[in-house]
Every structure is written in structure tokens, then in C-alpha cells.
Amino acid sequence: MRSTRLLSVRRLLALVVLPIFLFGGCNRGAKPSQIGKKAPDFSVSDGTHSINLANYRGKVVLLNFWASWCGPCIQETPALVELHHERPDLAILAVSIDEDPGAYQRFLNRFHVDLTTVRDPNQTVAKMFGTDGWPETYIIDRNGIIRRKVVGDPDWSNPEIRAFLQTL
């Protein structure tokens, strides 16, 4: 009886965990790379917050697309907040695709998110960048050129990532 129960638990874990490793993030596919191209200019407002990319020229920008229901986004958020505190010279712009403003606000409160955030439920900005997976982050240099696209929830404290950010 106990071995049958243990086997059932293992099967359940395999059904839940395996897809996470196979599909990584909340990604549904890939679009052509925009690396090396000028980042699309955008201005987005959700009635409470707004972001205009042109206001960040001259700064290194991490443009992060996320959703409150996305597991990897939940894992990544504390690291982005920590990076924001350690590197105030970086502009970390977080664009949520949440349709529910309540879920968006609860997420921000739960994780004490003090990044520049905006809710874009129609995914207008995500579509401009060819984003269809979450989390997805574009690293944009001081001249507005996309230098790297990061899909999933990387370790933002990784020395290689930190060194790359220093070069921009």
C-alpha cells in the first residue's frame, strides 16, 4: 500500500516537474532575434504607471516581461529587485501582461517590487519585441541597441551576467 502511494506521488511529481524542465519558463515559441538591432521605441501607460523607453537613453536597460501567474517570473522577481538595489545605475523596467489589475498589484505587494513597473494587458509592448514567453528580458545598451535576450529566470547574481552588464 505504501509503495503504491509512493509510486503515485512520484508519477505526480514527474508530471508536474518534467514539463518545467522541458519547456523552461512560460515560453510558447521563439521569434526572430532582435539582438544587435535598435530597441523599438514605446510608451505604455496603465492609468497608474507609465514607461517611455526614450526617457532611458544613456542608461543600460533591462526590459523584463512577466506575469503574476508565471512560476519562473515568481522565482526571478526577488533577484531583479536585489539587482535593482545593488545596481541603481541600471534601469530595470518590468512590463506585466496581467489582465487582472488586482493580481498585478498583489504580486507587487507580495514581493515588495520597487522597480519601475507597468501593466500592459494587451501585450502591445511584448508584441513589438516579438515576446511570447515569460519571463523574458531584453538587455538594452546606452545607445538603445538590444544586446541580449534572456528567456526564463536566470541567476542575475551570476558573475558572467554581472560582468556582461558591466561592459555596457
Predicted regions and their residues:
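Hydrophobic beta-strand core positions in alpha/beta domains
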Residues: 62-64, 94, 139
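N-terminal targeting signals for export/organelle localization
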Residues: 1-47, 158-168
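Thiol/disulfide oxidoreductase modules built on the thioredoxin-like
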Residues: 106-113, 121-166
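Signature tryptophan residues that serve as conserved aromatic anchors
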Residues: 42, 66-69, 156
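A short beta-strand-turn-helix
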Residues: 41-61
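Short pre-active-site segment immediately N-terminal to redox-active cysteine/selenocysteine motifs
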Residues: 59-61, 65-69, 133
